[in-house]
Amino acid sequence: MLRGQEERKYSIRKYSIGVVSVLAATMFVVSSHEAQASEKTPTNAAVQKETLNQPGEQGNAITSHQMQSGKQLDDMHKENGKSGTVTEGKDTLQLSKYQSTQNSKTIRTQNDNQVKQDSERQGSKQSHQNNATNNTERQNDQVQNTHHAERNGSQSTTSQSNDVDKSQPSIPAQKVLPNHDKAAPTSTTPPSNDKTAPKSTKAQDATTDKHPNQQDTHQPAHQIIDAKQDDTVRQSEQKPQVGDLSKHIDGQNSPEKPTDKNTDNKQLIKDALQAPKTRSTTNAAADAKKVRPLKANQVQPLNKYPVVFVHGFLGLVGDNAPALYPNYWGGNKFKVIEELRKQGYNVHQASVSAFGSNYDRAVELYYYIKGGRVDYGAAHAAKYGHERYGKTYKGIMPNWEPGKKVHLVGHSMGGQTIRLMEEFLRNGNKEEIAYHKAHGGEISPLFTGGHNNMVASITTLATPHNGSQAADKFGNTEAVRKIMFALNRFMGNKYSNIDLGLTQWGFKQLPNESYIDYIKRVSKSKIWTSDDNAAYDLTLDGSAKLNNMTSMNPNITYTTYTGVSSHTGPLGYENPDLGTFFLMDTTSRIIGHDAREEWRKNDGVVPVISSLHPSNQPFVNVTNDEPATRRGIWQVKPIIQGWDHVDFIGVDFLDFKRKGAELANFYTGIINDLLRVEATESKGTQLKAS
């Protein structure tokens, strides 16, 4: 029996030794594989960190699999590290084989994932190297362009390109150049909301090499719309409307934001001039217009057509302004004419009557541009009782004729004056034509009609297209009219060099005339009871007559800008905002208490509903992020919140909230729109020629 027990112990010992040997061999194999895997595979912490950069579900799947594999390996080590826990050798051997198989699968999976990650990192590294090479080539091109510009006397500067948005230095003076490369149609995306920068492509690099003098600035390129395509797209967006003025008042926000008081205003103005605001086009496809800096020896202005700014009621400009009278266009905040000329733009400020009617002002505007002695017309002079001829203008464009156009920008009453002059150019003056046929003599070319294609665009700023209650209830009252005419009478003395614009009515003392005789003569003038003056033309009835006299020109781009500086009080009436020009407090309250609610919101002098567009003419709402290039329809820009009537021209020296940088942005934005009008016209001419 003892011998049997010894044989049994010997068999168990022999079997145990065999099992231990198998386990030792298995652990050796597993350890060798694990060592190899550790050389090729990062640790669990490294894997998890690497996985954070994996996009989407792929990274999550890799992380989960790696963590599961690591857990299995840890479990295996725990199982192998325990001694005396194996009760049955057969089961232990099977478990070891199973774990070995699972570990082999896990290691293969890890190796496959590692190879895939290495491949992706290699591709990403190659992509970065390609981008770096392209950026280096572009920087070299920019350096070459800079040296080339310096050799030609150019003073423009360059800066390094950004790898994300490819921003390049802004150009103070820009000129639209044609580019015949066609582009595919794109969707409308306002640049102010587009935070995604396009990636550089070989096609873009090729374009840069093809035009080494053209710089791709941070501004959106000028984009031109095919005429047929533009009409189709815009008609589907919004059909022209007539008369429904209340739709403009609500839901339109201010494009301007108050400027930080701590910011250097001069630097802001400089930045605004160097980087004028540009707006993307609707259905923007078509030939992108590049910009080129103005060279030091370049005389050609940036704009093809001269821009003429026309002042409003009480406006005095240039040499005709008294010493203490503020600079009409921009005040001391931003001198519009001076600054735009510095940038290379051909701009002018017209000087017309400050108190005269829209009729007289329109005639004077014509001769300001064309040159010559003002001819108000024989019929008009006989009808109202003032002189037929007025002052003589030198003219800024003596060769002004069909095909040679101008851009017209009018503030307040200036917008009405512009519209009437264009109507006379195109359709003539029926009264003057009839009078000329009946009496013979001379007739001004302005009144004969047939002079189309002489105006490219009409832009109005705070213009009372439909009149103002302030004129009805205040400005055109007998008491106020007497004060205005008395002022003209006083300024007409022989020692005064200021012309308020009523000399055709006799408001100018003759050289050999005493002041007493001059007063007696002027007191007999018909102007005291006439409607041929600004006070009447700004009323609701006077403006309605003008609207009936004028029509839309299908070849002209019309744009309006409107401000609002009033708020609704507890009783539902409009009160002037804090900061509104103090001289407009009374007129703002007169308008704000009108019986018609839709006529109450105002800018201090003009109701919002009147400034949007003439009530009897078609209009379309446009955003600040699209160019105003449509023709034959009023394009109504969003209402500018917080801007009163004189904020458009910056003459309120007490308003520290409105700074010159705002005016710089505003007027450079207008100029950019006018350049787009010219570019669109050039594109249309090319299409017709082809």
Swiss-Prot record:
Keyword line: Calcium, Hydrolase, Lipid degradation, Lipid metabolism, Metal-binding, Secreted, Signal, Zymogen
Residue ranges that the Swiss-Prot or TrEMBL entry lists as coiled coil: none
Residues annotated for Ca(2+) binding in this entry: G579, D644, D647, D652, D655
Lineage start: Bacteria, Bacillati, Bacillota, Bacilli, Bacillales
Top-rank taxon, per record: Bacteria
Protein name, as recorded: Lipase 2
Entry keyword annotation includes Lipid metabolism: yes
SUPFAM superfamilies: alpha/beta-Hydrolases
Gene Ontology CC terms: extracellular region
Family: Belongs to the AB hydrolase superfamily. Lipase family.
EC number: 3.1.1.3
Leader sequence segment: 1-37
Compositional bias per record (Polar residues), positions renumbered to this chain: 53-71, 93-114, 124-171, 185-206
Region span, Disordered: 53-266
A GO term for molecular function: metal ion binding
Reactions catalysed, as given in the entry: a triacylglycerol + H2O = a diacylglycerol + a fatty acid + H(+)
Gene Ontology biological process terms, A to Z: lipid catabolic process
Active site annotation, chain numbering: S412, D603, H645
Composition bias type Basic and acidic residues, residue spans: 72-81, 225-237, 257-266
UniProt subcellular location: Secreted
Propeptide segments, given as residue ranges: 38-295
